[in-house]
Amino acid sequence: MTLGVTPRQQNMFGSTVSYCGGRVPAGSIYGVLHRECFTLFPDEMFADLFTDVGRRSVPPMIVAVVMVLQRIEGCSDREAVDRFAYDARWKYAAGGLDFDYPGFVHTVLACMRARLAASTRPDRIFEVTLDAARKAGLVGRKRVLDSTPLYDAVATMDTVTLIRSGIRGLLKAAGADLEAELRSVIGRDDDYAAAGKPVCDYDDPAARKELVDALAKDAMALLRVLDGRELDEPASQSGELLATLVGQDLDEGPGGVFTIARRVAKDRVISTVDPQARHGHKTAAHGFDGYKGHISIDPDSEIITATLVTAGNTGDAASAGDLLAQDLPTQDVPATDVAGDGDSPPDQVSTAHGPDATGNETNTATEMEAPLAVYGDAAYGAGVLLEKLEAASAQIMTKVQPPVAPGGRFPKDRFTIDTGAGSVTCPADVTVPIQPDKAGGGTAAFGTACASCPLAAQCTTAKTGRTISIGRYEAQLTRARATQQDPAWRAEYRATRPKVERKIGHMMRRRHGGRRARVRGQTKVAADFSLLAAATNLARFGVLGLTRVAGPGWAVAPS
């Protein structure tokens, strides 16, 4: 398929320009795209996606405009092509096309997404909007980080459905000879052809247990057949998934009987249709299934500077380094003890979809003179991130939670922790050494000194005395807690950080394709989220009055 070209010659009597020009606000996303679509998304920008032979494609500039409007309005593919065919604003946004300009089928949008995903610059539409914002001076040296749940596009499966779907997937992925061998070891009276739950009297506990055991034995028999074999990629992936499902949800009891485990695996797969989705918690009381969408914004212009999608169980602090990859110097910081207090395990890190691969300078000389300032709520107040920001000489505006004070007793910050001297001094002026551990932290045990201490009742109820855990990043956390006691710091934090909440609200206003993912798989969800960020930036351009000018290329209209 060869590159199609967007027509620039308009029909004087049938163009949408004369009709929409006085009706569509210049500051709307339709007005912005109408004025700047040929500059932002020229057909040549997508030339690498097409060949030199074949029939002409739908002009990619038109497709890009439709994709952007589809994301901002939360349309499905079919709804989007219908809007382009019948809504004059959409043709007006695509350069002022004629009313009778032909539409196209919805599969063109899916084809364009696939071409972009297979290219070296899958997020080029977002990159273009960010580059325009930089050239207009809208991207400074402040970054506010936050995340939001993205509900997956599939149903969460229970254990029985998971195991049976895993078996079905393996049988489907296996070649004819291997499938015949696998089916020969199946013990249940089930051909595993139809999807869904197997037939069972689910009101009968004994029948449920028998079903779980039978499914588990079938799964284990299949895995034994695969053990030690060289498999092609589909069969290998299906076998690994089945082994994961059995291991995470089942326990083998006395007599080799399998039962559902009374626990939740740390990285539990929740669906065989989208194996990358995970259980997540935005707060202790708010759980969800799917992914997390992370964004970084410039708080002064409210332009989104970076996006990232991770599994739902990934911590916010673990993703911050990827969000700030274009702003922080490259450095190697071990991703251990993410919480930094010695009590929490490291979060699972996901791959970022970086914001800028256009080849343009990401920071002007003026921007580089100012230190980077990073804002975030307490989810970003982790030691590993604080260390990275300190190493980059960044201004740390991420909130750090105060130490826990069980039962109203002395919190950790009442103790003087001297990591240099390797000692801890309690409020009663008793000093004990820190016993280091392999993770880089340690513990300080006061032991028998607490027995005769007059402050013991205010400090601990443990018979063995108070013990203080020292995390690897204790010094960074202590400095951050001290800094955020400054009233000026608090005023700046309260005035700046909430802006990212409003931006997330703008992105999530449409449930379809906003809060609810339209596609399956982390890579596709990330590409969709990046496109949503691009559409949100374009809408912001209209509010700011961004226009094309000579010289730097872009400027904000004077207010």
Q: Where do the protein language model's features map onto the residues?
A:
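DNA-recognition alpha helix
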Residues: A80-Y92
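Alpha-helix boundary/capping segments in eukaryotic regulatory proteins
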Residues: E73-V81
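Anion-binding and metal-coordination hotspots
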Residues: E79, L97-D98, P102, T107-S559
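A short glycine/serine-rich beta->alpha loop
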Residues: L49-R56, V519-Q522
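Function-dense linear segments that define catalytic or interfacial modules
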Residues: C37-E44, E73, S296-D300
